[in-house]
Amino acid sequence: LADLDGSTHRLADYRGSAVLLNFWATWCAPCREEMPSLERLRRSLDGRRFVVLAVNVGEGARVARDFTQKMPLGFTFLLDRDTRTTKAWGARVLPASFIVGPDGAVRYSYFGALDWSREDLRAAISALIE
């Protein structure tokens, strides 16, 4: 998938790191509400082998960029304009999040908004990158 600047990212590019893949859209209120806790999680694990990839579902770069400029978030935003990737992951509800281990295997999947600063979620991710 392309990021907001047009660079292509593949999950394989992140092998060796845990990846939180979050599917979202600007029209999805729960998606917008969970973004700050995703950023807190990212910051709390800064410097470790962990990355957040936020996949915007069905919207264009301008819509996604406008959103990101209003909210200071330090993770990578990707665009799934045709929703094929979203469907391939089985993300029928937004937000949908998948935690992929450093080996590339999906370890956890969550449907609906979460508070990513919860200790149990942080501990599950930390266990993957220790």
What is the meaning of each model-derived region?
Residues 1-19, 42:
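A short beta-strand-turn-helix
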